[in-house]
Amino acid sequence: LMKIKFGAGGIASYFDKVKNQEILQTDKFFGGEVIQMTAPGTAWEKVMPVNMNDFDKTSLHEFKTVRAIETPLRYLVEKEAKFSYFTLRERFILNKFSGELIVEADVQNWTGEKARELRIVFPVNLDKSFKASYEIPFGTVEMGRDEIDYSILPENYECQFNPDKYGRKDLPYREAVNWADVSSGDYRGKGCLFASDMTVHLFRDETT
């Protein structure tokens, strides 16, 4: 159903053989590639934009294969890269019969370096007209259509909705309960459904 090729920092190609479509666009980042950015401030007291200071990514290091297994149901490839402050151990698991891809990432031997943020990148092969939706408690929200404009809320200095913390700006991230969907919005169109145990998802590239 699916064909995967690995590159220097993760998945170089995730090809749907049934639809004859390339799922990822990996000219800048690989699928599942881990990037490191500097995140000044704190998540609760002083929210500040991330920046490119001390930027790092998987493809800048040797990403060696430490285990490769095939079972009747799936393929598993485990790879490892040594960053400056930690060792990344990442597993790519492909279900043979559904095309489902599972990516598991472990950060080992972290040195405790402050103000660093790690992100896992999945560059879906879509143009800027894509539609994104995500799960919330008891429902689904589509970005740009169903969301509340938080900038019109009255100031409340006990939460994030005040000028010093929120700045009356559009949040770059979304908090999803279990899944986020990014697609062309067309019937039988391109896209991906991401089921994740991570809460915060970003839908635009903040690197320069």
Task: Label each PLM-derived region with a short phrase.
Residues 16-51, 128-161, 165:
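Acidic glycine/proline-rich low-complexity segments
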Residues 1-109:
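Catalytic and substrate-binding regions of extracellular carbohydrate-active enzymes
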Residues 3, 13, 76, 119-121, ...:
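Generic structural signal for residues positioned in beta-strands
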Residues 97-142:
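Acidic (Asp/Glu-rich), glycine- and aromatic
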Residues 169-208:
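Beta-strand-rich recognition/accessory modules
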Residues 6-9, 72, 100, 113-117, ...:
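Generic recognition of stable, solvent-exposed alpha-helical segments in well-folded globular domains
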Residues 61-65, 87-91, 136-138, 147, ...:
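Short structured motifs
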